[in-house]
Amino acid sequence: MATKSDPNYKIIAENRRARFDYFIESDLEVGIVLTGSEVKSLRTGQSNIAESYASVENGELWLINAYIAAYKQAGVFGHEERRRRKLLVSRKELARLWQAIGREGMTLVPLVMYFNDRGKVKLKIGVAKGKKVADKRETAAKRDWNRQKQRLLKQG
């Protein structure tokens, strides 16, 4: 998993809203099929996965609506910025994901996109259930209380 302190991973894009908007039940590291200009654009850090989601269609896993900026030096050989990108996952994992999202209210949300220690682009997706407004308020209240506790412990 890509963490901010781990030197072997370089985080490209992070979906910060995912943990606020969804209950994440489980997560999975998957590969992603990219073109050369997309990889070069990712190396410059020009991407956004905040509005994207993953979907299982025709026995394949797809990343939909992820933004990877056009690479300027690619010229006419560039790529479409919001094209559908195939995600690489084993059949066993795909069956597990298909079963998980078959339940009511479940979806696949991209959490983090990063380069692993071998320089390959990986995507961490989570099986998630949407939060209601009251749940979001509760999460915010817990976070505020934890910050307040830390301040109090630091002071005294």
Swiss-Prot record:
Molecular function in Gene Ontology: RNA binding
Keyword Cytoplasm: yes
Localisation per UniProt entry: Cytoplasm
Principal location listed in the UniProt entry: cytoplasm
Record flagged with keyword Iron: no
Cellular component aspect of the GO annotation: cytosol
Keywords assigned: Cytoplasm, RNA-binding
One GO term of the biological process aspect: trans-translation
Function: Required for rescue of stalled ribosomes mediated by trans-translation. Binds to transfer-messenger RNA (tmRNA), required for stable association of tmRNA with ribosomes. tmRNA and SmpB together mimic tRNA shape, replacing the anticodon stem-loop with SmpB. tmRNA is encoded by the ssrA gene; the 2 termini fold to resemble tRNA(Ala) and it encodes a 'tag peptide', a short internal open reading frame. During trans-translation Ala-aminoacylated tmRNA acts like a tRNA, entering the A-site of stalled ribosomes, displacing the stalled mRNA.
HAMAP family (UniProt xref): SmpB (MF_00023)
NCBIfam families linked to this entry: PRK05422.1, smpB
Family: Belongs to the SmpB family.
Name assigned to this protein: SsrA-binding protein
Gene giving rise to this polypeptide: smpB
